Amino acid sequence: MWFKNLLTYRLTQEVPFEPEALEAALASKPARPCASQELTTYGFVAPFGKGEDAPLVHVSGEYLLIAARKEERILPSSVVNDAVKEKVEEIETEQMRKVYKKERDQIKDEIIQAFLPRAFIRRSMIFAAIAPRLGVILVNSASAKRAEDLLSTLREVMGSLPVRPATVKVAPVATMTDWVKSQQAAEGFHVLDECELRDTAEDGGIVRCKRQDLTGEEIQLHLSTGKVVTQLALAWQDKLSFILDDKMVIKRLKFEELLQEQAEQDGGDEAAQQFDASFQLMMMTFAEFLPVLFEALGGEEIPQGV
């Protein structure tokens, strides 16, 4: 269990995440298939294992892991629009009258309902790790919308979930731009060979650099003309590499081989033990990494009450 993306959410109040109570709460909204006339369903699933006996909360030391699954019927808009157009033309030709918006919308709804049972189904899972002592929920996603879907559903079953995205005191753009300009990142961090530069002017240009020396004259020239760094590839110690963006999203997160080998040694041969060992080691790494990252970005803005 290694996260590939990371969104960090800060609990603004202390929440007693008791595993048994959380298990019962998640069980009140299990994932289920879409009914024939449903566009989408959303609910919780076991993060590891299958079957009714698989727990919805994976407990590893002080850390908890949960997962949710979204199931949705895929109706291509072009297919629906073509069917609506064909039906409207048929009515206007046969009845010699114009079809206006209200009737067109009704036709569209009827066509969607007729097509739904035959639509393809797409399933997607999302994981979240809860670290009560650290006061954070970590979501394995680069999409704020997907993360908010999970958190709002968790809030629904728990009754309350005081949480907000983690923020820092200095805009990440300013810090990343300074690191590339000065050719020196904060202690423990190393700038790699990929970045995105944007012009600060409205509708300004975008430059994406890959496998490029970011200390070179070309990059410095872009920065001197007013562009800023909005995404930056970084490495931390000998443990992690990742892309950091201007919204504090961590993407393409990669745990270095030494960590993965350690998890394999700790986990042994059983799949369940391997899963638990990698999750535990990942969370211990995050517990060390996130405070250092926040400090490097100017310090975390801690909400009142925390």
UniProtKB/Swiss-Prot annotation:
Its main location: cytoplasm. It comes from the Bacteria. The lineage of its organism: Bacteria, Pseudomonadati, Pseudomonadota, Gammaproteobacteria, Pseudomonadales. The gene is rdgC. GO terms for biological process: DNA recombination; regulation of DNA recombination. NCBIfam families: PRK00321.1-2, PRK00321.1-3, PRK00321.1-5. Belongs to the RdgC family. It is found in: Cytoplasm, Nucleoid. Keywords: Cytoplasm, DNA recombination. The keyword DNA-binding does not apply. Pfam families: RdgC. GO terms for molecular function: double-stranded DNA binding. It comes from Pseudomonas putida (strain GB-1). May be involved in recombination. This is Recombination-associated protein RdgC. One of its GO terms (cellular component) is cytoplasm. InterPro entries: RdgC.
